[in-house]
Amino acid sequence: MSSAPLFYGGINVYLQQHIPIFRHLPRFIDRVLDYPRLVSSFAKLPASIDTNDLSALALSMVRGEHGHQRKEVRRLVKWMHHQSRPDVIHFSNLLIAGPVREIKQSFSIPIVVTLQGDDIFLESLSQPIRSRIVSEMQELATLVDRFIVHSRFYAEKMTRYFNISPDRISQVPLGIDATDYLHAASQDRKQADTRPGRRIGYLARICPAKGLHLLIDSFINLKQQSSFDDLKLWVAGDLSEADRHYFEAQEQKIKKVGFDADFYYAGRLSRPAKIDFLRQLDLFSVPAPYQEPKGRYVLEALASGIPVVQPAHGAFPELLARTGGGELFSVDDSGALTEVLANLLTNHEVRSRLAKEGPEGVMATACADHAAQATMDIYRQILSE
């Protein structure tokens, strides 16, 4: 198959949604707007997010050939006609699977869709448009041959949410390319035992859904106890303009009680910087109040040899049962996170055991090779049916 062009380029999608003339302009203009460097530059610009705009765009996208981006659907299908026929077509989520109808009409090719958080986005939208989008997605789901999820919890949730029969959902345990994380974890960490202060870390998107405010509350509670006066909180991750006010409010909470000198925000990190960040922690927690379908950040911490503390809901109980390397806290107990963090911070023996379990568990069950093999097995099964 030749090198694929860009389909559904962000600039074109936006303009086709908002300015009718762009739905009919010739391809040479679309090609200019799809220029990768131009798309990348626009993606980096700060932008405020209008929920109504997002809702309308999502509805249009899932409607496929009946939406405002129908030109993109037709171009994709036309391009596929001139390529070697693929054995399987795999969409990374159902929200972008609008072309499925046209693809099914043109080709006899199995369609696979990974479900990994579509519902989280949908639940952020207001009614009645949310119900319209879900209804369109339920209709799309009937055309999909197989769905892939990363946990039993999410499989059960998706059967209800999109009216999918359980036999059409397969589980592929989440995996990551952990080589450099594992290498870092295997190196001598004696300097971690001699550095001043203990460190709790958070590495995920900065937003209410990931629960940074809950971790900050626990950090403050611990710091107010004399036995944790050396404690520090390190935070890293993407911060959007939409969530800046939320983050500033959290910073003010810490400053108000005089602990700002022990709080550090590292910003968005490259992969090498992530690895270095994680190696310097004693504990890791992203106490997401919503039911996380994946939890990739947990695998990164575990692979780095950092014990994790996560809520006992969503994908986390299954993930930690598989890998070890962490403990769960009850989401129904407001003091449970603080209690588990305190117990681990004061119990070096348990922390050491968990730090050893994490990399071993990731290596045995959660590397990218395991996920790739499980996905290939599903492809083979579909093709044999």
Each model region followed by its residue ranges:
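Short hydrophobic beta-strand element within catalytic cores of glycosyltransferases
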Residues: 307-310
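Conserved donor-binding/catalytic core segment of Leloir-type glycosyltransferases
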Residues: 191-210, 216-219, 234
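Nucleotide-activated donor-binding/catalytic signature segment of Leloir-type glycosyltransferases, i.e.
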Residues: 247-269
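Glycosyltransferase donor-sugar binding loop
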Residues: 232-251
